[in-house]
């Protein structure tokens, strides 16, 4: 079988971009079991409840749901187990320092295969207040309406 090239998206956490202000992003490798990789290759995963915790100098991904592999036997994995993230020491120290200082949290944004290896995009994020969410939604809607108006104007259709 030919080696995979490029990036193949498995799961995306759209809720994280809605609930948090994203400050910085990192790409991390994942330590996975065989049946987890097979389940991911089927495109089955959920990042909705996921978060990253740094414990004794190691980054761990919690709450990510990778369902059991359908053809797996007794060697199948637990669906919501914690998984170790592979990051450089400098990155782990920087993330830990910023989380402790500024009260930020670390959330997963996307899970994908990059050149055949499972990767997760994690982000340092700060929680949005409910009025922030409403303001962002209103701004997005206003931008959409102006783009539609410009598009209609360019096509010759007047309001």
From Swiss-Prot:
Pfam families listed in its UniProt record: SmpB
Primary localization: cytoplasm
Coiled-coil spans in chain: none
CDD domains, sorted: SmpB (cd09294)
Molecular-function GO terms, alphabetical: RNA binding
Protein localization: Cytoplasm
Region of interest: Disordered: 137-159
A biological process from GO: trans-translation
UniProt keyword Transmembrane present: no
Compositionally biased tracts (Basic and acidic residues): 137-147
Keywords per UniProt: Cytoplasm, RNA-binding
Parts of the chain that traverse the membrane: none
GO terms under cellular component: cytosol
HAMAP family assigned to the protein according to its UniProt record, in alphabetical order: SmpB
Main function: Required for rescue of stalled ribosomes mediated by trans-translation. Binds to transfer-messenger RNA (tmRNA), required for stable association of tmRNA with ribosomes. tmRNA and SmpB together mimic tRNA shape, replacing the anticodon stem-loop with SmpB. tmRNA is encoded by the ssrA gene; the 2 termini fold to resemble tRNA(Ala) and it encodes a 'tag peptide', a short internal open reading frame. During trans-translation Ala-aminoacylated tmRNA acts like a tRNA, entering the A-site of stalled ribosomes, displacing the stalled mRNA.
Family: Belongs to the SmpB family.
Name used for this protein in its record: SsrA-binding protein
Source organism per UniProt: Nocardioides sp. (strain ATCC BAA-499 / JS614)
Gene encoding the protein: smpB
